[in-house]
Structure formats: C-alpha cells, structure tokens
UniProtKB/Swiss-Prot annotation:
Gene Ontology CC terms, in alphabetical order: membrane raft; plasma membrane
Subcellular localization, as worded in the UniProt entry: Cell membrane; Membrane raft
UniProt function note: Found in functional membrane microdomains (FMM) that may be equivalent to eukaryotic membrane rafts. FMMs are highly dynamic and increase in number as cells age. Flotillins are thought to be important factors in membrane fluidity.
Oligomer status and interactors: Homooligomerizes.
Keyword tags: Cell membrane, Membrane, Transmembrane, Transmembrane helix
Organism ancestry: Bacteria, Bacillati, Bacillota, Bacilli, Bacillales
Domain of life: Bacteria
Keyword Nucleotide-binding: no
Lipid bilayer topology: Multi-pass membrane protein
Similarity remark: Belongs to the flotillin-like FloA family.
Protein name listed in UniProt: Flotillin-like protein FloA
NCBIfam families: PRK13665.1
Keyword Translocase part of the UniProt annotation: no
Amino acid sequence: MFSLSFIVIAVIIVVALLILFSFVPIGLWISALAAGVHVGIGTLVGMRLRRVSPRKVIAPLIKAHKAGLALTTNQLESHYLAGGNVDRVVDANIAAQRADIDLPFERAAAIDLAGRDVLEAVQMSVNPKVIETPFIAGVAMNGIEVKAKARITVRANIARLVGGAGEETIIARVGEGIVSTIGSSKHHTEVLENPDNISKTVLSKGLDSGTAFEILSIDIADVDISKNIGADLQTEQALADKNIAQAKAEERRAMAVATEQEMKARVQEMHAKVVEAESEVPLAMAEALRSGNISVKDYYNLKNIEADTGMRNAINKRTDQSDDESPEH
C-alpha cells in the first residue's frame, strides 16, 4: 500500500514538472539569472498564456542588459505584440549608444513598426551610404543631348525616418536638378568643361527636404555626349513638311484627274447632242421640202456646198501632213 502511494505521488510530481517545463523555459530562466536579469517564473508563464515566445523577448533583454540599456520586459513584449522585430530594435539601440546617437527605445520601435530598417538607419548614420543614379539625359540650349551619372552620398536622418521620403525621391530630385542644369547651359561644352557646376547647383537646392536622408555630397561620376536632338528635330520637321507637301500635291493631282474625266464626260455628252441634232437634219429637210420652205434646187445647191467644203478640208489635211513629213533644210 505504501509503495502504491509512493508511485502515485511520484507520477503526480513528474506530470507537474512536465507541465511546468512546458510552460516555463527553465534554460532561458537560468540564462537570465546568470546574466543578472531578474525575470520571474510567473512572467514567463504569462508570456506563454499571451502567446508570446519568451525567447524572442528575454534573449534581447539579456543583450540590452549586457550593453547597459535600461529596458524592461513590458517594453519588449509590447513591441513584440505590436508585430515589431524586438531583436533588431535592441541591436539598433545598442549601435546608437555606441555611436553616441540619441535614439530612445520608443522612437526605434516606431521606426521599426513604420516598416523601416532601424538598424540599417543607425548604421547609415555612422557610415553614410552612396546612391548611384542611372544615366540622366538633358538637352543643352544648342540642341546637344548630354547624359550624366551622379553619386549621391547620404546619411540617414533618424528624426525624419517616420514619414520621410526614401531613396527613390532623392534620385528623382537629383535627376530633375541635373536635367535643369544641363538645359540652362548655352553650350554642351560648358557641361563637359565644368561638371562640378551641376553638383553645386543641385546641392544648393536643398533636395533632401522632407526625406529620411541628409545629402552630404553630389558628385558627377560620368558625362557623355549622346546625340544632336536639335538636328534630329529639324530633320523630322523637314520630313513632316515634305510629306505634307507630297500629300497636297497628290490631292491636287487627283483633283486634276477628276476634272479631266469630268470634262471628257461633258465632251461626250455634247458630242451625243450634236449627233442627235444631226440625226434630225434629214427630217427637217424633208419637212421643209414638203412644206415648200425650200426648193429642190436649193437642196442640191446645199449638197454641192457641203461636198465642196468636205473636199477642201480633205485637201488641206493632206497638205498639212505633207508639210509635217518633209525634211528640214
């Protein structure tokens, strides 16, 4: 009986220990105690009940304590529950402390929740980043296209990381400044001879306003001559004028052809009327003879006149052809 009771008690103890170990990461608790971070077992159990991974909170807390940061479990757990990256925020705070940058935990957490890489921002504040633009084309006043590539050295502005514009805005603004500077040059050789004028002009415009960066310098890395845009435009305009002139000439030719066809149709119409009128002449002559308006003698005289006229016309026609065929002396 005694042995049975002992076995039951032992089983209960083992089950209790298993339940305890499933809720309380004893190894993590011991590590925290060894690091001088006092975390109660009840706190760890509460994290389990709130579906918070204790390791993702306690491990960064140990790291912060070793770095001398006064952070609490509640701060880290709140940031974890908000969907933030606790480990990265703590690393950013440690890096900021080492670089003597004022970065409270609340600001770092806000930057992280805003979707920014807060650790990279701190590192960029210490080691500025170089952004290289693609070739940006501008046209000088003499019509020559000039392409320039710039290297922009920027430093993260932690105070404007939340709500500030990103790298794309910096590149777009610098590109706009390069195009404006090239376009205001009277000759493309001015750009080639003094590329630093682009840097000075662009840098003086305060292009980092409203962005998450501070522009330290803008250096022109390369300048190339592309093509003569002015000449190309003039060529295209001349070609367009030529096409317009050809189209108008074709229109006039079509109108002339249409007019010619219309005149031919009218000639045929008039010829048909003449034939119709000639066909009525015999009827009119017969009616005149019948009514006595013309005598038979007059009729034959008219026929003789027509025959004489036809003969003269034939003779004249043959004479003209002979003159045309005779060789020149």
